[in-house]
Amino acid sequence: MGSSGSALRVCADHRGGINWLSLSPDGQRLLTGSEDGTARLWSTADGQCCALLQGHESYVTFCQLEDEAAFTCSADCTIRKWDVRTGQCLQVYRGHTSIVNRILVTEDQLFSSSYDRTARAWTVDKGQVSKEFRGHRNCVLALAYSAPKDLPSDPCLEAAMGAGLLVTGSTDDTAKVWQVASGCCHQTLRGHTGAVLCLVLDVSSHTAFTGSTDATVRAWDILSGEQLRVFREHQGSVICLELTERLLYSGSADRTVKCWLADTGERVRTFPAHRHSVSALKYHAGTLFTGSGDARARAFDARSGVLQRVFRGHSFVINCLQVHGQVLYTASHDGALRLWDVRGLQSVPPLPQRPATKRSLSRLFSNKVACAAPVPLQPA
Protein backbone atom coordinates (compact mmCIF):
# COMPACT_ATOMS: atom_id res chain seq x y z
CA MET A 1 0.00 0.00 0.00
CA GLY A 2 2.97 2.35 0.45
CA SER A 3 4.04 4.34 3.49
CA SER A 4 2.83 7.86 4.30
CA GLY A 5 4.97 10.86 3.33
CA SER A 6 5.49 13.74 5.73
CA ALA A 7 5.09 17.39 4.70
CA LEU A 8 8.13 19.55 5.35
CA ARG A 9 6.24 22.79 4.77
CA VAL A 10 2.81 24.03 3.69
CA CYS A 11 2.77 27.32 1.76
CA ALA A 12 -0.78 28.67 1.77
CA ASP A 13 -0.21 32.27 0.64
CA HIS A 14 -2.35 32.04 -2.51
CA ARG A 15 -6.04 32.88 -2.17
CA GLY A 16 -7.10 30.61 -5.01
CA GLY A 17 -6.14 27.30 -6.57
CA ILE A 18 -2.67 26.86 -8.03
CA ASN A 19 -2.88 25.99 -11.72
CA TRP A 20 0.80 25.48 -12.48
CA LEU A 21 4.21 25.11 -10.88
CA SER A 22 7.57 25.72 -12.60
CA LEU A 23 11.13 25.09 -11.39
CA SER A 24 13.98 27.32 -12.58
CA PRO A 25 16.76 25.61 -14.59
CA ASP A 26 19.27 26.33 -11.80
CA GLY A 27 16.91 24.83 -9.21
CA GLN A 28 17.00 27.91 -6.96
CA ARG A 29 13.40 29.09 -7.36
CA LEU A 30 9.86 27.89 -7.92
CA LEU A 31 7.06 29.80 -9.62
CA THR A 32 3.35 29.22 -8.95
CA GLY A 33 0.44 30.64 -10.97
CA SER A 34 -2.95 30.89 -9.31
CA GLU A 35 -6.68 31.39 -9.70
CA ASP A 36 -6.25 34.49 -7.51
CA GLY A 37 -4.66 36.30 -10.49
CA THR A 38 -1.16 36.36 -9.02
CA ALA A 39 2.03 34.38 -9.34
CA ARG A 40 4.54 33.83 -6.56
CA LEU A 41 8.25 33.08 -6.50
CA TRP A 42 9.56 30.69 -3.84
CA SER A 43 13.07 29.83 -2.70
CA THR A 44 13.91 26.12 -2.85
CA ALA A 45 16.50 26.71 -0.12
CA ASP A 46 13.96 27.50 2.62
CA GLY A 47 10.51 27.33 0.99
CA GLN A 48 9.85 31.02 1.65
CA CYS A 49 7.92 33.27 -0.76
CA CYS A 50 10.43 35.75 -2.16
CA ALA A 51 8.24 37.76 -4.57
CA LEU A 52 4.57 38.39 -5.34
CA LEU A 53 3.86 39.03 -9.04
CA GLN A 54 0.72 41.15 -9.41
CA GLY A 55 -0.76 42.68 -12.55
CA HIS A 56 -2.94 40.15 -14.32
CA GLU A 57 -6.65 40.99 -14.39
CA SER A 58 -7.84 37.37 -14.26
CA TYR A 59 -6.57 33.96 -13.18
CA VAL A 60 -3.13 32.71 -14.18
CA THR A 61 -3.40 29.61 -16.35
CA PHE A 62 0.27 28.66 -16.76
CA CYS A 63 3.78 29.82 -15.95
CA GLN A 64 7.39 29.17 -16.90
CA LEU A 65 10.42 30.12 -14.84
CA GLU A 66 13.86 30.85 -16.26
CA ASP A 67 16.93 31.77 -14.23
CA GLU A 68 16.61 35.52 -14.89
CA ALA A 69 12.92 35.98 -15.72
CA ALA A 70 9.48 34.56 -14.97
CA PHE A 71 6.69 34.27 -17.55
CA THR A 72 2.96 33.96 -16.86
CA CYS A 73 -0.16 33.76 -19.02
CA SER A 74 -3.72 34.44 -18.04
CA ALA A 75 -7.42 34.38 -18.80
CA ASP A 76 -7.04 38.16 -19.26
CA CYS A 77 -5.64 37.33 -22.76
CA THR A 78 -2.12 38.53 -21.92
CA ILE A 79 1.32 37.14 -21.17
CA ARG A 80 3.69 38.86 -18.76
CA LYS A 81 7.44 38.77 -18.19
CA TRP A 82 8.77 39.48 -14.67
CA ASP A 83 12.11 40.23 -13.04
CA VAL A 84 12.79 37.36 -10.61
CA ARG A 85 14.80 39.56 -8.24
CA THR A 86 12.44 42.52 -7.89
CA GLY A 87 9.07 41.05 -8.93
CA GLN A 88 8.67 43.96 -11.38
CA CYS A 89 6.69 43.37 -14.60
CA LEU A 90 9.12 43.86 -17.49
CA GLN A 91 6.85 43.22 -20.47
CA VAL A 92 3.19 42.67 -21.35
CA TYR A 93 2.47 40.66 -24.49
CA ARG A 94 -0.90 41.63 -25.99
CA GLY A 95 -2.62 40.19 -29.05
CA HIS A 96 -4.62 37.12 -28.12
CA THR A 97 -8.37 37.66 -28.01
CA SER A 98 -9.24 34.93 -25.51
CA ILE A 99 -7.74 32.94 -22.62
CA VAL A 100 -4.05 32.12 -23.07
CA ASN A 101 -3.66 28.45 -22.16
CA ARG A 102 0.04 27.68 -22.42
CA ILE A 103 3.37 29.35 -23.04
CA LEU A 104 6.74 27.94 -24.06
CA VAL A 105 9.90 30.04 -23.78
CA THR A 106 13.01 29.26 -25.82
CA GLU A 107 16.27 31.20 -26.09
CA ASP A 108 14.88 34.13 -28.07
CA GLN A 109 11.23 33.28 -28.71
CA LEU A 110 8.06 32.82 -26.73
CA PHE A 111 5.24 30.63 -28.03
CA SER A 112 1.65 30.75 -26.77
CA SER A 113 -1.63 28.89 -27.31
CA SER A 114 -5.12 30.23 -26.78
CA TYR A 115 -8.85 29.66 -26.77
CA ASP A 116 -8.93 32.10 -29.71
CA ARG A 117 -7.91 29.10 -31.90
CA THR A 118 -4.42 30.43 -32.58
CA ALA A 119 -0.87 29.91 -31.46
CA ARG A 120 1.60 32.79 -31.63
CA ALA A 121 5.33 33.39 -31.62
CA TRP A 122 6.67 36.49 -29.87
CA THR A 123 10.03 38.21 -29.60
CA VAL A 124 10.93 37.77 -25.94
CA ASP A 125 12.59 41.17 -25.47
CA LYS A 126 10.22 43.42 -27.44
CA GLY A 127 6.97 41.60 -26.74
CA GLN A 128 5.88 41.76 -30.37
CA VAL A 129 4.10 39.04 -32.33
CA SER A 130 6.52 37.62 -34.90
CA LYS A 131 4.23 34.90 -36.28
CA GLU A 132 0.60 33.88 -35.93
CA PHE A 133 -0.35 30.25 -36.50
CA ARG A 134 -3.94 29.97 -37.76
CA GLY A 135 -5.71 26.80 -38.85
CA HIS A 136 -7.11 25.04 -35.80
CA ARG A 137 -10.91 25.01 -35.65
CA ASN A 138 -11.09 25.12 -31.87
CA CYS A 139 -9.14 25.91 -28.71
CA VAL A 140 -5.36 25.36 -28.86
CA LEU A 141 -3.96 23.71 -25.72
CA ALA A 142 -0.61 21.92 -25.80
CA LEU A 143 2.69 23.21 -27.24
CA ALA A 144 6.06 21.66 -28.08
CA TYR A 145 9.03 23.00 -30.04
CA SER A 146 11.79 21.37 -32.05
CA ALA A 147 14.79 23.66 -32.54
CA PRO A 148 16.64 23.85 -35.90
CA LYS A 149 19.63 21.97 -34.47
CA ASP A 150 17.37 18.98 -33.76
CA LEU A 151 16.00 18.79 -37.32
CA PRO A 152 17.55 17.03 -40.36
CA SER A 153 20.22 18.97 -42.20
CA ASP A 154 18.66 19.14 -45.65
CA PRO A 155 19.31 22.11 -47.99
CA CYS A 156 15.87 21.61 -49.56
CA LEU A 157 14.18 22.04 -46.18
CA GLU A 158 16.45 24.73 -44.75
CA ALA A 159 14.16 27.64 -45.62
CA ALA A 160 11.08 25.89 -44.23
CA MET A 161 12.67 24.60 -41.02
CA GLY A 162 15.36 27.20 -40.44
CA ALA A 163 13.57 28.54 -37.35
CA GLY A 164 12.37 25.16 -36.09
CA LEU A 165 8.99 23.46 -35.89
CA LEU A 166 6.15 24.15 -33.45
CA VAL A 167 3.69 21.38 -32.57
CA THR A 168 0.23 22.28 -31.22
CA GLY A 169 -2.62 20.18 -29.87
CA SER A 170 -6.25 21.29 -30.06
CA THR A 171 -9.76 20.45 -28.97
CA ASP A 172 -10.57 20.14 -32.70
CA ASP A 173 -9.18 16.56 -32.39
CA THR A 174 -5.97 17.33 -34.30
CA ALA A 175 -2.39 18.29 -33.70
CA LYS A 176 -0.54 20.50 -36.16
CA VAL A 177 3.11 21.01 -37.03
CA TRP A 178 4.05 24.57 -38.00
CA GLN A 179 7.05 26.08 -39.74
CA VAL A 180 8.09 28.82 -37.33
CA ALA A 181 9.95 30.76 -40.04
CA SER A 182 6.91 31.16 -42.30
CA GLY A 183 3.97 30.52 -39.99
CA CYS A 184 2.69 27.92 -42.47
CA CYS A 185 1.20 24.60 -41.42
CA HIS A 186 3.75 21.88 -42.21
CA GLN A 187 1.57 18.89 -41.29
CA THR A 188 -1.84 18.20 -39.76
CA LEU A 189 -1.85 15.10 -37.55
CA ARG A 190 -5.28 13.49 -37.95
CA GLY A 191 -6.45 10.32 -36.24
CA HIS A 192 -7.75 11.21 -32.80
CA THR A 193 -11.52 11.23 -32.30
CA GLY A 194 -11.39 13.51 -29.26
CA ALA A 195 -9.64 16.63 -28.02
CA VAL A 196 -5.83 16.53 -27.83
CA LEU A 197 -5.13 17.41 -24.18
CA CYS A 198 -1.38 16.85 -23.94
CA LEU A 199 1.69 16.21 -26.03
CA VAL A 200 5.39 15.51 -25.61
CA LEU A 201 8.11 15.63 -28.24
CA ASP A 202 11.06 13.30 -28.70
CA VAL A 203 13.35 15.63 -30.64
CA SER A 204 15.94 12.95 -31.41
CA SER A 205 13.48 10.84 -33.42
CA HIS A 206 11.26 13.74 -34.57
CA THR A 207 8.32 11.99 -32.91
CA ALA A 208 5.37 13.66 -31.20
CA PHE A 209 3.23 11.74 -28.70
CA THR A 210 -0.31 13.05 -28.20
CA GLY A 211 -2.88 12.16 -25.53
CA SER A 212 -6.59 12.61 -26.10
CA THR A 213 -10.09 12.38 -24.67
CA ASP A 214 -10.54 9.42 -27.04
CA ALA A 215 -8.51 7.39 -24.48
CA THR A 216 -5.57 6.83 -26.83
CA VAL A 217 -1.99 7.99 -27.12
CA ARG A 218 -0.66 8.34 -30.66
CA ALA A 219 2.87 8.65 -32.02
CA TRP A 220 3.55 10.80 -35.09
CA ASP A 221 6.46 11.61 -37.36
CA ILE A 222 6.41 15.42 -37.28
CA LEU A 223 8.33 15.69 -40.57
CA SER A 224 6.06 13.49 -42.70
CA GLY A 225 2.87 13.67 -40.63
CA GLU A 226 2.65 9.86 -40.58
CA GLN A 227 0.88 8.21 -37.66
CA LEU A 228 3.41 5.69 -36.34
CA ARG A 229 1.63 3.95 -33.46
CA VAL A 230 -1.58 3.96 -31.43
CA PHE A 231 -1.51 3.12 -27.69
CA ARG A 232 -5.04 1.87 -26.93
CA GLU A 233 -5.35 0.33 -23.44
CA HIS A 234 -6.67 3.30 -21.43
CA GLN A 235 -10.39 3.41 -20.60
CA GLY A 236 -10.62 7.18 -20.10
CA SER A 237 -9.16 10.46 -21.33
CA VAL A 238 -5.37 10.71 -21.41
CA ILE A 239 -4.59 13.80 -19.34
CA CYS A 240 -0.80 13.91 -18.98
CA LEU A 241 2.34 12.41 -20.53
CA GLU A 242 5.95 11.99 -19.40
CA LEU A 243 8.75 10.72 -21.67
CA THR A 244 12.04 9.47 -20.26
CA GLU A 245 14.67 6.88 -21.21
CA ARG A 246 12.61 5.61 -24.19
CA LEU A 247 9.67 4.97 -21.88
CA LEU A 248 6.40 6.86 -22.19
CA TYR A 249 4.15 7.29 -19.13
CA SER A 250 0.50 8.25 -19.60
CA GLY A 251 -1.89 9.40 -16.86
CA SER A 252 -5.60 8.97 -17.40
CA ALA A 253 -9.11 9.61 -16.17
CA ASP A 254 -9.37 5.82 -15.79
CA ARG A 255 -7.34 6.28 -12.55
CA THR A 256 -4.21 4.56 -13.85
CA VAL A 257 -0.80 5.38 -15.24
CA LYS A 258 0.54 3.16 -17.99
CA CYS A 259 4.16 2.73 -19.03
CA TRP A 260 4.86 2.03 -22.72
CA LEU A 261 7.91 1.33 -24.84
CA ALA A 262 8.02 4.54 -26.86
CA ASP A 263 9.56 2.84 -29.90
CA THR A 264 7.07 -0.04 -30.21
CA GLY A 265 3.91 0.95 -28.34
CA GLU A 266 4.07 -2.14 -26.12
CA ARG A 267 2.52 -1.63 -22.69
CA VAL A 268 5.11 -2.55 -20.07
CA ARG A 269 3.37 -1.80 -16.80
CA THR A 270 0.22 -0.34 -15.23
CA PHE A 271 0.33 1.76 -12.05
CA PRO A 272 -3.04 1.51 -10.22
CA ALA A 273 -3.97 2.72 -6.69
CA HIS A 274 -5.41 6.12 -7.64
CA ARG A 275 -8.99 6.87 -6.57
CA HIS A 276 -9.62 9.59 -9.15
CA SER A 277 -8.18 10.86 -12.44
CA VAL A 278 -4.39 11.08 -12.71
CA SER A 279 -3.70 14.77 -13.24
CA ALA A 280 0.10 15.10 -13.09
CA LEU A 281 3.24 13.01 -13.70
CA LYS A 282 6.92 13.51 -12.89
CA TYR A 283 9.76 11.03 -13.32
CA HIS A 284 12.83 11.56 -11.14
CA ALA A 285 15.79 9.29 -10.40
CA GLY A 286 13.96 5.99 -10.85
CA THR A 287 10.76 7.12 -9.13
CA LEU A 288 7.49 7.99 -10.84
CA PHE A 289 5.53 10.64 -8.92
CA THR A 290 1.84 11.09 -9.66
CA GLY A 291 -0.77 13.65 -8.69
CA SER A 292 -4.47 12.86 -8.68
CA GLY A 293 -7.96 14.23 -8.38
CA ASP A 294 -8.15 12.30 -5.10
CA ALA A 295 -5.94 15.07 -3.61
CA ARG A 296 -2.95 12.78 -3.10
CA ALA A 297 0.48 12.43 -4.60
CA ARG A 298 2.08 9.03 -4.88
CA ALA A 299 5.58 7.68 -5.44
CA PHE A 300 6.01 4.47 -7.43
CA ASP A 301 9.18 2.58 -8.15
CA ALA A 302 9.28 3.15 -11.91
CA ARG A 303 10.93 -0.19 -12.70
CA SER A 304 8.76 -2.50 -10.60
CA GLY A 305 5.54 -0.50 -10.39
CA VAL A 306 5.45 -0.89 -6.59
CA LEU A 307 3.71 1.92 -4.70
CA GLN A 308 6.26 3.21 -2.20
CA ARG A 309 4.71 6.27 -0.63
CA VAL A 310 1.44 8.23 -0.45
CA PHE A 311 1.52 11.97 0.29
CA ARG A 312 -1.68 13.09 2.07
CA GLY A 313 -2.61 16.63 3.05
CA HIS A 314 -4.15 18.42 0.09
CA SER A 315 -7.93 18.76 -0.04
CA PHE A 316 -8.37 19.17 -3.81
CA VAL A 317 -6.89 17.94 -7.09
CA ILE A 318 -3.10 18.16 -7.48
CA ASN A 319 -2.43 20.09 -10.68
CA CYS A 320 1.34 19.96 -10.90
CA LEU A 321 4.46 18.29 -9.47
CA GLN A 322 8.15 19.19 -9.35
CA VAL A 323 11.11 17.46 -7.71
CA HIS A 324 14.36 19.12 -6.64
CA GLY A 325 16.99 17.29 -4.63
CA GLN A 326 15.20 15.27 -1.95
CA VAL A 327 12.05 17.39 -1.98
CA LEU A 328 8.78 16.85 -3.84
CA TYR A 329 6.69 19.98 -4.52
CA THR A 330 2.95 19.59 -5.10
CA ALA A 331 0.62 22.39 -6.22
CA SER A 332 -3.10 21.96 -5.75
CA HIS A 333 -6.43 23.52 -6.56
CA ASP A 334 -6.82 23.95 -2.78
CA GLY A 335 -4.38 26.90 -3.09
CA ALA A 336 -1.49 25.28 -1.23
CA LEU A 337 2.05 24.47 -2.26
CA ARG A 338 3.34 21.55 -0.20
CA LEU A 339 6.91 20.37 0.26
CA TRP A 340 7.53 16.67 1.00
CA ASP A 341 10.57 14.68 2.08
CA VAL A 342 11.28 11.98 -0.52
CA ARG A 343 14.43 10.52 0.98
CA GLY A 344 14.60 6.75 1.33
CA LEU A 345 12.75 5.74 -1.85
CA GLN A 346 14.51 2.54 -2.94
CA SER A 347 14.31 0.58 -6.17
CA VAL A 348 12.69 -2.85 -5.81
CA PRO A 349 12.58 -5.88 -8.18
CA PRO A 350 9.82 -5.85 -10.83
CA LEU A 351 6.61 -7.73 -10.12
CA PRO A 352 4.85 -9.94 -12.70
CA GLN A 353 2.00 -8.11 -14.43
CA ARG A 354 -1.57 -9.37 -14.27
CA PRO A 355 -3.79 -9.00 -17.35
CA ALA A 356 -5.43 -5.58 -17.40
CA THR A 357 -9.11 -5.46 -16.44
CA LYS A 358 -11.39 -3.01 -18.17
CA ARG A 359 -13.74 -0.69 -16.34
CA SER A 360 -16.35 1.80 -17.46
CA LEU A 361 -16.35 5.40 -16.34
CA SER A 362 -19.47 7.40 -15.56
CA ARG A 363 -17.82 10.54 -16.89
CA LEU A 364 -14.57 11.48 -18.53
CA PHE A 365 -12.05 14.14 -17.63
CA SER A 366 -13.00 17.44 -19.26
CA ASN A 367 -9.93 19.65 -18.97
CA LYS A 368 -9.44 21.46 -15.64
CA VAL A 369 -12.98 21.36 -14.28
CA ALA A 370 -13.64 17.62 -13.95
CA CYS A 371 -10.41 16.98 -12.13
CA ALA A 372 -11.21 19.81 -9.72
CA ALA A 373 -14.40 18.22 -8.47
CA PRO A 374 -14.23 17.57 -4.71
CA VAL A 375 -14.14 13.89 -3.80
CA PRO A 376 -14.48 12.16 -0.43
CA LEU A 377 -11.09 11.35 1.02
CA GLN A 378 -10.81 7.67 1.94
CA PRO A 379 -7.85 5.83 3.43
CA ALA A 380 -5.36 4.88 0.72
Question: What kind of region is each of these model predictions?
Answer:
Residues 25-26, 65-67, 105-107, 147-152, ...:
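Residue-level detector of Asp-centered blade-edge/turn motifs that repeat once per structural unit
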Residues 33-36, 73-76, 113-116, 169-172, ...:
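Conserved strand-to-loop turn within each blade of WD40 beta-propeller repeats
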Residues 303-310, 315-380:
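Terminal intrinsically disordered, low-complexity extensions flanking WD-repeat/beta-propeller proteins
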